[in-house]
């Protein structure tokens, strides 16, 4: 499984979640831009990705159009207003929120 991690703080205070994913053989792709990604940057990063651990980056219809393998978006933070949830639902992409993580 290929996981895009856009949040720069994910795993910063506790490495256990990252370690668990690596132990399962998952490929973790960290945010190489080190800032909240623009729509264009997200469009470049999502092809071939199965899951996104999402910070404040925007997941629009245009981003989802490029996400050919995406199955789940897990919002690492508060709220999901940065995700086109209606479009994700149409495509059968699950959207979750990780509570109490910030």
Residue map of PLM features:
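N-terminal glycine-/charge-rich "phosphate-binding" loop or analogous flexible N-terminal tail
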Residues: 1-49
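Phosphate/diphosphate ligand-binding glycine-rich loop within oxidoreductases
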Residues: 50-102
């Amino acid at each position: 499984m290929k996981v895009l991690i856009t949040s720069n703080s994910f795993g910063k205070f506790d490495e256990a979640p990252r370690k668990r994913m690596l132990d399962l053989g998952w490929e973790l792709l960290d945010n190489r831009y080190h800032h909240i990604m623009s729509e264009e940057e997200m469009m470049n990063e999502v092809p071939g990705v199965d899951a996104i651990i999402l910070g404040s980056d925007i997941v629009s219809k245009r981003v989802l159009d490029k996400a050919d393998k995406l199955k789940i978006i897990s919002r690492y933070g508060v709220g999901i207003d940065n995700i086109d949830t209606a479009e994700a639902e149409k495509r059968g992409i699950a959207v979750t929120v990780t509570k109490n993580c910030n």
